[in-house]
């Protein structure tokens, strides 16, 4: 009976997580595709990072400050801020008016950061190279960070959005397809 209860609870938690992830993907995939078109960052990477860093939109940072990527203030940030406990207590994080601003700033953050420049030499469909490169460049402190986005990308087939991000026409038809689901 205990084993059955454990399996049932685990299954319900996995389904809830899957539902949250699927809802996040449905809601934010168009933004990730748009960012890919504008900045040449794989949509799969942007979505996987958003899912990870925001807890599929349920983290305190995402809910209270629209920060979907866990980006800290840094020395040159002049926008809104929020305090949050992370690696240390009461750290400064960027705050945004809406999720779209967070997605745009994430792209700008990667494009402007010299430590990420080598990533833009990778193929746009090389999500594994991007994930490993983000870890190598110091995007996150988690030692297993590179594997986490790769697993999400493969489990949720986010790599499909990378090819859809190639043209604006494809993105529009894809958005119509998403709305039908």
Regions found by a protein language model. Give the residues of each.
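Hydrophobic h-region of N-terminal signal peptides that target proteins for export
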Residues: 3-13
């Amino acid at each position: 009976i205990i084993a059955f209860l454990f399996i049932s609870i685990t299954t319900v938690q996995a389904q809830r997580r899957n539902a949250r992830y699927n809802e996040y993907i449905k809601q934010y995939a168009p933004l990730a595709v748009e960012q890919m078109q504008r900045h040449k960052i794989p949509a799969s990477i942007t979505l996987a990072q958003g899912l990870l860093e925001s807890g599929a939109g349920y983290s305190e940072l995402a809910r209270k400050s629209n920060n979907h990527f866990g980006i800290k203030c840094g020395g040159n940030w002049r926008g809104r801020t929020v305090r949050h406990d992370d690696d240390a207590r009461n750290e400064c994080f960027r705050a945004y008016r809406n999720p779209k601003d967070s997605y745009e700033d994430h792209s700008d953050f990667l494009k402007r950061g010299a430590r990420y420049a080598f990533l833009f030499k990778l193929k746009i469909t090389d999500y594994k190279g991007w994930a490993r490169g983000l870890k190598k460049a110091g995007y996150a402190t988690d030692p297993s960070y590179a594997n986490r986005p790769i697993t999400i990308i493969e489990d949720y087939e986010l790599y499909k959005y990378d090819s859809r991000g190639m043209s604006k026409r494809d993105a529009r038809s894809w958005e119509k397809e998403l709305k039908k689901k």
